C-alpha cells in the first residue's frame, strides 16, 4: 500500500489498477513495457504521467506519429530539459543530418518520382510508347508505391518486394519491381535531397550511428503504426540499460 500511495503522489492523480501496474513496472521493474489498449482508454495520458516517475538525470525520447500529436504533447508535458519530444521522421532527419555532416538537409517529396520521370528509359526495356496514358501513369505510380513500401519495410530483394505487391494488391504492368530496387540504389547514393521516407530508411540502410541520439527511456505513442524502418530507427537510439515504453492498439494499425 505504501508503494501505491507514493506512486499516486508522484503522478498527481488516482490511477486505475492497470495504470498502477504500469507505473510499478516503470519504477521497480526491468526491461521494456508494451501497453495495449483500445482507442480513448488513456494510453497517451498514461505515458505522460509515467514521465513523472523517471529521474531528471535520465534522458528521455518521446516519439509520436505526427506533428500535430507532437504539438499536443509539448503543450501537455511542457518544457522539460531531459525530455525530447519529436516524430520518428524528425529523429531520422536529425540522424541523417549529423551523419552526413550537413547543417541542413534539402527536403524534396518529389525526389523519386521526378528522377523516374526523367530517367525511366534508362531503367527499362519496355516499349513505353506502347503504353496508353492511363497505363503509363499507373506504371509510374506502381514504381513509386513500391519504392515507398520497400523502404518502409526495409525490403531490398525481388522476393521481399513481391510479397509487398501481394500485400498491397499492386497490379503490375511489367518490370516495376526491378526498377524500384534500382532506383532505391540511386536514392542511397544521392542524399543531397531527401524525402520523408528517406528520413527513416537511410539511417538503417546506410548503417548510420546515433551520434548523440541515445536515450535511457524511449516512449512510443500509437506504436502500432510504426513501420519496420521506424522501429529499427528507434532501436538505434538505445544504449546499455535503455528501456522502451510503447503504447498502441493493434486494431487501429495502418501498416
Task: Give residue ranges: language-model regions.
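Accessory N-terminal region flanking or inserted into the helicase ATPase core
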Residues: 2-24, 32-35, 46, 126-219, ...
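P-loop NTPase Walker
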Residues: 2-103
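Conserved helicase motor core of SF1/SF2 NTP-dependent helicases
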Residues: 36-47, 57, 65-68, 86, ...
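Active-site catalytic microenvironments for nucleophilic, acid-base chemistry
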Residues: 53-54, 76, 98-99, 119, ...
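Conserved phosphoryl-transfer catalytic core
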Residues: 92, 102-130, 241-253
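Activation segment
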Residues: 92-95, 203, 227, 254-255
Amino acid at each position: 500500500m505504501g508503494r501505491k500511495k507514493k506512486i499516486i503522489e508522484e503522478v498527481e492523480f488516482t490511477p486505475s489498477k492497470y495504470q498502477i501496474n504500469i507505473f510499478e513496472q516503470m519504477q521497480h521493474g526491468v526491461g521494456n513495457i508494451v501497453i495495449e489498449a483500445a482507442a480513448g482508454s488513456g494510453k497517451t495520458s498514461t505515458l505522460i504521467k509515467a514521465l513523472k516517475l523517471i529521474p531528471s538525470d535520465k534522458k528521455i525520447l518521446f516519439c509520436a506519429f505526427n506533428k500535430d500529436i507532437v504539438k499536443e504533447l509539448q503543450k501537455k508535458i511542457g518544457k522539460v530539459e531531459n525530455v525530447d519530444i519529436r516524430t520518428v521522421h524528425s529523429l531520422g532527419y536529425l540522424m541523417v543530418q549529423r551523419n552526413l555532416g550537413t547543417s541542413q538537409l534539402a527536403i524534396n517529396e518529389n525526389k523519386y518520382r521526378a528522377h523516374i520521370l526523367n530517367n525511366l528509359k534508362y531503367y527499362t526495356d519496355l516499349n513505353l510508347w506502347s503504353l496508353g496514358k492511363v497505363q503509363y501513369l499507373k506504371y509510374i505510380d506502381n514504381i513509386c508505391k513500391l519504392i515507398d513500401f520497400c523502404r518502409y519495410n526495409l525490403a531490398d530483394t525481388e522476393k521481399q518486394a513481391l510479397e509487398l505487391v501481394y500485400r498491397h494488391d499492386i497490379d503490375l504492368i511489367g518490370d516495376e519491381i526491378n526498377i524500384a530496387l534500382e532506383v532505391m540504389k540511386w536514392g542511397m547514393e544521392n542524399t543531397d535531397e531527401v524525402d520523408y521516407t528517406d528520413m527513416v530508411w537511410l539511417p538503417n540502410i546506410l548503417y548510420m550511428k546515433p551520434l548523440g541520439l541515445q536515450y535511457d527511456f524511449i516512449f512510443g505513442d500509437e506504436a502500432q503504426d510504426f513501420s519496420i524502418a521506424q522501429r529499427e530507427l528507434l532501436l538505434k537510439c538505445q544504449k546499455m540499460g535503455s528501456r522502451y515504453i510503447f503504447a498502441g492498439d493493434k486494431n487501429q494499425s495502418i501498416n
